[in-house]
Amino acid sequence: MSEISQYTEGLHEECGVFGIYDKTGETDMVSAVYSALYALQHRGQESCGIALNVDGVLSGHRDLGLVSEVFTKRVLEELPHGAKMATGHVRYATAGQRSRSNAQPMILHHCKGAMALCHNGNLVNAPKLRRKLEMSGSIFHGTSDTEVIAYLLTQNRLLTPNIEMAVSRTMDDIEGAYSLVIMTHTKLIAARDPHGFRPLCIGELPDGSGYAFASESCALDAVGAKFLRDVRPGEIVIADHTGLRSMDSHCGTAPHTICVFEYIYFARPDSVVEGTCVHEARLQAGRFLAQEHPVEADVVIGAPDSGLDAALGYAQESGIPYGIGFIKNKYVGRTFIQGSQKQRENSVRIKLNAIEATVKGKRVVLVDDSIVRGTTSARTIRLLREAGAKEVHYRISAPPFAHPCYFGTDIPDEKQLIATGHTVEEINKLVGSDTLGYLSIEHVQQLAIHSHCGFCTGCFTGRYPVDPPAETMDIVYDKPLSVSNPSKKL
């Protein structure tokens, strides 16, 4: 499998955002956000943070690490209590380096009041905006595109009568994927880009005492909030003492194209995204996969965790018995969202163990959600061979990843994708399976069972709803600023 090593570098991000407002002040905000971030931990494992609003004063804590590592009992006890509003964030970096300065929420202080900002997504015009802001005097402390949004918000707040108008004006400036939660001294605001690339939903607290915004509905469940609806693409939603209200000036300005990978991999199975339960969508993907790529076999198993639902769907459609083929070490993070390639390879070695009783001497259908680099796939198939599987037929509930993502998913460079420049048969040989079948793009586009939204499928097709950036933020970090008179000393 030595050929695979050249396709095992790259890939980056996903984030989770959360905000909660309780006009009565009876909700324990520290406990609520802590619980919500646990529910969203699968969306980012590099850093996390909580910001609280106590009597109009914003403060918080953020650091590198998992929620359980950053928010120890001591830290939780030292956070201010009595807040009526709070925000939280989990991060895995796509735009910006892995550092504490890039952790969120970002708390901003300016002459019209403080605000805390949480962002999920990627801006395609962040390099251009950052350079413009630096030329106007802005000093950046981190390397993420969220800081670009922060500076634009503070500038626009000086030019507008209220924060929601500043958010609207900022949305005029930024392009790409963004689901935002913003907290001021009196308001909690959610905003979503006009394409709706990343999910964002609204929940109501018990007894109608307030509202919550979250990347996924599972976080609403964690705090006992009732799911109301998704934030519409382009919508700004404001929660304050008057209730809930909406601004829709950016709604309908672009086609709705949520990232299809939310259904395939990122979102938790119990979450409802755009009206469709993620578990149900993955079951349907497995059924479609069985229709497209049937095979004679003895057992169907899934690659934990996001391949399990599709495997069950494949078994239901094909009539082949479903089995549990692997035991997963729950204390090793997901390989797809860990920082370096060496970390990923080490975690693959200790992450899974095949159950010999399920696969020995059998023809196995292994269902997985994707093949990105190929490292994990090859190792997983090798585990099945070592456990005695007679045949391994690999089935993928997504089309081949052959193109980078610019909107907040961990796929940055075509050179790092095994599907780039290789046929399906070549990939089959590289990962070591007997046969390989991918789900078609036509069936992928039917996974939003209970909604009429479209999908961004750029990582499969190379066709994007928004033009890709001409340069990345990584280039901007190292590029010196140009000035009109280079010889003049500043």
Language model segments and positions:
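Phosphate/diphosphate-binding loops
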Residues: 169, 218-219, 226, 234-235, ...
